[in-house]
Amino acid sequence: MMRNIITPAVLSTMIPQEFEDWRDGGEVLRRELTHAAMRDLTCPAGWDMNGEYRSEFGGFFPVQIRFTPSRGNFSLAVCSPGDISPSWMVVFIPVSGRPFSVIRTLPAWSSEVITHTLSLVAHLDADGYSQASIISVLAMEGAA
């Protein structure tokens, strides 16, 4: 059986419908796609990284990876293009689930930019910034 290999280069060239096709291919293909993105990202120290394989996080995106600090007071969701959005998004989600904020959009996969965003949020959180302040800093950086 021939297998498709999803590399960072492949992730950066996929169009939204291809992500949806992988999701429609079932849990095994969706897991492969999610793990390809997870392998290319650096999780901040002391944070958890969890991928969606069924509909654990609502099932809105073909790839959704949640990064959560140990206190668990918010998560960052890395969401792939698909039917909902043509772009990669990083979404700030408070523990209550709302209001959420899209803090970064990317026309193509860029693990460097996403990892930078994760790292910046981790540092701001560790330094005691409020959630509103973290979102404001990202907006000033041009991320939001």
Describe each PLM feature range.
Residues M1-M2, S80, V90, A143-A144:
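Intrinsic low-complexity, intrinsically disordered segments enriched in polar/basic residues
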Residues M2-S70, I134-M140:
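Negatively charged, low-complexity tracts enriched in Asp/Glu with abundant Ser/Thr
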